[in-house]
Structures are given as structure tokens and as C-alpha cells.
Amino acid sequence: IVLLMVVTSNADRICTGITSSNSPHVVKTATQGEVNVTGVIPLTTTPTKSHFANLKGTQTRGKLCPNCLNCTDLDVALGRPKCMGTIPSAKVSILHEAKPVTSGCFPIMHDRTKIRQLPNLLRGYENIRLSTSDVINAETAPGGPYTVGTSGSCPNITNGEGFFETMAWAIPKNKTAMNPLTVEVPYICTKGEDQITVWGFHSDNETQMVILYGDSKPQKFTSSANGVTTHYVSQIGGFPNQTEDEGLKQSGRIVVDYIVQKPGKTGTIVYQRGVLLPQKVWCASGRSKVIKGSLPLIGEADCLHEKYGGLNKSKPYYTGEHAKAIGNCPIWVKTPLKLANGTKYRPPAKLLKERGFFGAIAG
């Protein structure tokens, strides 16, 4: 801790000290223990919990898409049809969803992959945009030709059947089993950004698997990018009818994952029947600091603190709960600090001939 000093004369030097008693004029020094002084200035405050706010002078992001009503951040990240919009740039992002949140669309097996981490991954970037073109032509991909499937459980903006914008449900026109095939995922971002490519696969009960794909056996899938390879085998059947958006209930499930492609790097996906091929990709650049918090963001604050919310800095130090903080924040200390702004106190009955340095404290 940097010690703050006030020079009161050539002979007296008073330094920051910790409070020793209820008296505001007693400080504990490193060399002379408890010392009475003629005046002190408090240097610490104990904050009270408040709402979170926008960080002063900094673009602060709450929801990924503020204008996407009734949408979770995962809805936005996957491109749910009713949750398409612009993600504003931000230097600071609030991790506001306290627990893993599902997507209100086709039932997803969230625990099979890291897909719930996707919104947090996007929050960590300053600039995020969805590509205007598809990364793969799903209809003519290996193993096709395919029809791009839609679902009543994932309605579009006109309440017709839809599907996620980031993926194409590849339903083969020829209902036959297929050995694993490979498709390359090119890099299509145009500004040197990281490319986040979403993909997945669908599985259902044996009857539906035969109807949709001509094969009722478990299917194998693999993704690879930047030296990271992930393998999956689909689960056949055993799912209760379910919907995540009060739409048409589904007996099937989808597993969704993503790969991160660095500029110019190609990814690969090895798949069998039921693949959800990548379509629009996220192009992301810059860094955004992420802090746990809550919405709405009200007003502005000097500092965002995970335990106290938005803080305005009134003192250089604070006591209380120690946690991550972003911005112009006070420094956490265990014990309240005060700055002596007077001289060493001398009782009137006792004359002191020598006036000298009486120590700095341990911070």
C-alpha cells in the first residue's frame, strides 16, 4: 500500500495510520504504537449494496441484444428466429444470468456440450456481428442432396416453422445410412476477427430416425479447429415429448456445440445423419471485460463491484467484502485507515522539548 504523508513542519511528519480506538484522534504507528494526534481524515468507506450501472465513460453491455425482447442471451447466440438483432459494442460486459439458461426453441441437450458457455464467450469480445452469408451450402453438402428442415417448436417472426439462423438441419432426400463424411468450414469473416461457428446434430426415437434419415443406429460426429477435436455419439430415443417455447412438442433432441476459428484457419466437421450444418457465423474482435452482475443497469458509476454493484469513489480505500471490480475503484483494505492532518498531541501539563519524527505505519 502506498503511504500517504502530510508534512506539518520541519520537525513533525504525520502519516497514514489505522484507527486504534473509538477516538478519531488516535492512530497506531509502526514505530511508536498508539499515538494521539490533533486531527485525522478518514480514508476508508464501507459500501452498501446497490444496483448495477453503466461504467462512466465506458460502453457497458447488459443483454447481448437489448432490443431482442423475451430472449435469453443463448437465444441470441444461437440465432433463434425471433431473437435476431444487433449486439452493441462494449468495453465492459455484465454477466447477468445467474444460472445456466436454456434457449426457448427446439429442445437442446445442454449438458452434453459446452454450449451454455457460448453467450459468455461472446460477452468477452468488444465487437460482435453475425455474418450476412452462410459458411456452408447445406443443400449440397457431402452426403446430400439435403432439404433444410424447420420445426414448429422454433417459430419465426410470422409464427411459421423456423430454425436457428446459425445452423441448417440437413434432412437427406435419400433415406439411407451413411458412413462418416467430412466437410470443411472455411473462414469467412472479413476483418481479421475470431470466427465462432455453431454446429450440432439431431437425434430421435428409432421410428423417427428411420423416417427422417433412413438409419436408426447411433450416429457419430466430430469437430476440429485450432488443434481442438471433440467427438460425439448420438443418443437414440428415451426422450419425453418436450418444448422450450410453448410450441409443438418434440420427441427428439439436438446437441449443439461451437468451434472458434482464428483468422484464415479452416475447421472441419465429420458427420453422419442428423447433422446441423453451420450457417451464419459470429465474427468477433477486441476484448470486453466481464463482471458478474445484474440488470437493469441504472445510471452511471465510477466502479462496478461484484458484491456491491455500482460504486462512486468517495474515498481511496474501502472495507467490507473483497471481490472483483472494474473501473475507477477504491482499494480494498482489512482495517479502516485514517490520515493524520495535524501534529502529535501533547498534554498541556507536560512540556516536550523535542519534536521529532514518530513513524510510519505498516500498510
UniProtKB/Swiss-Prot annotation:
Is the Membrane keyword given for this protein? yes
Q: Family, per the entry?
A: Belongs to the influenza viruses hemagglutinin family.
The region annotated as signal peptide is 1-11
Please give the function described in this protein's UniProt entry: Binds to sialic acid-containing receptors on the cell surface, bringing about the attachment of the virus particle to the cell. Plays a major role in the determination of host range restriction and virulence. Class I viral fusion protein. Responsible for penetration of the virus into the cell cytoplasm by mediating the fusion of the membrane of the endocytosed virus particle with the endosomal membrane. Low pH in endosomes induce an irreversible conformational change in HA2, releasing the fusion hydrophobic peptide. Several trimers are required to form a competent fusion pore.
Q: What is this protein called?
A: Hemagglutinin
Lineage here is: Viruses, Riboviria, Orthornavirae, Negarnaviricota, Polyploviricotina
Residues annotated as glycosylated are: 36, 70, 156, 174, 205, 241, 312, 341
Q: Which gene encodes it?
A: HA
Database matches in Gene3D superfamilies: 3.90.209.20, Hemagglutinin Chain A, Domain 2
Alphabetical list of Pfam families matching this protein: Hemagglutinin
